[in-house]
């Protein structure tokens, strides 16, 4: 079976890691030339892998990607090939319309059950998203995040409100707390209150009112 790996268009992730190479026959793996362009990975681990291009794409049985895939990326795939990754809803619809003869395996649709835990790429990516979101937000604020005592006086800790208490939200709360912020969390589901408070944050309860 020949497997191809497309590069992440944002350049920060890759669908293939060096540790995984030991499990596969390297002669059957093909990689996009830009797949590790912006990643701090050892390039020598990939020198033995064959290039994925318009010619070799026609031979692939499976193509894997992380970020997004467009019809132009897989236009040359043979009939009955499979594409595996995290699909954008719009792109997925277009691919199905143009190439109904190939199979699409969308990790966004993977059920979050114990048996599929080692395949739960969505949760792992959401976890990283929550972490990186707080770090990026901290760079945008004009104040420091933790409380600080200086010669000019005390600086109060930043106040952070996290909207949505899913995998990303919980990681965002944990990261903001570690940075020293005062954190609140909000979700339309009141039953996540315990999860928010278990991380040391306060849960924002909003009551809905209606007007006649």
Feature locations, PLM:
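Glycine-rich phosphate/diphosphate-binding loop of Rossmann-like nucleotide-binding domains
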Residues: 7-41, 146-212
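A short acidic, often aromatic-flanked loop/helix-cap motif at beta-alpha or helix-coil junctions
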Residues: 55-59, 110-115, 209-212
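Glycine/serine-rich phosphate-binding loop and adjoining beta1-alpha1 elements at the start
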Residues: 2, 72-157
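An N-terminal-biased, well-structured beta-alpha scaffold segment characteristic
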Residues: 2-101
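N-terminal start-of-chain detector that recognizes signal peptides
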Residues: 40, 55-57, 132-136, 155, ...
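Residue-level detector of short coil/turn "hinge" positions at structural boundaries
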Residues: 48-53, 104, 183, 203
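Short, hinge-like loop/turn segments at secondary-structure boundaries
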Residues: 46-50, 121-125, 201-205
């Amino acid at each position: 079976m020949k497997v191809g790996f497309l590069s992440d268009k944002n350049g920060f992730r890759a669908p293939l890691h060096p540790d995984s190479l030991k499990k596969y026959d390297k002669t059957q793996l093909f990689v996009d030339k830009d797949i590790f362009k912006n990643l701090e990975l050892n390039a020598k681990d990939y020198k033995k892998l064959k290039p994925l291009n318009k010619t070799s794409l026609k031979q692939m049985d499976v193509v894997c990607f992380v970020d997004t895939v467009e019809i132009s990326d897989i236009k040359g795939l043979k009939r009955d090939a499979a594409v595996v990754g995290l699909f954008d809803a719009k792109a997925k619809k277009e691919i199905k319309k143009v190439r109904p003869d190939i199979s699409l395996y969308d990790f966004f649709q993977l059920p979050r059950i114990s048996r599929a835990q080692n395949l739960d790429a969505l949760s792992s990516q959401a976890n990283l998203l929550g972490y990186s979101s707080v770090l990026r937000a901290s760079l945008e604020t004009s104040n420091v995040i933790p409380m600080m005592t200086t010669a000019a006086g005390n600086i109060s800790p930043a106040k952070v409100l996290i909207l949505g208490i899913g995998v990303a939200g919980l990681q965002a709360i944990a990261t903001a707390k570690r940075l020293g912020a005062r954190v609140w969390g909000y979700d339309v589901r009141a039953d996540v209150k315990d999860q928010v408070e278990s991380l040391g944050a306060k849960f924002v309860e909003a009551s809905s009112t209606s007007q006649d």
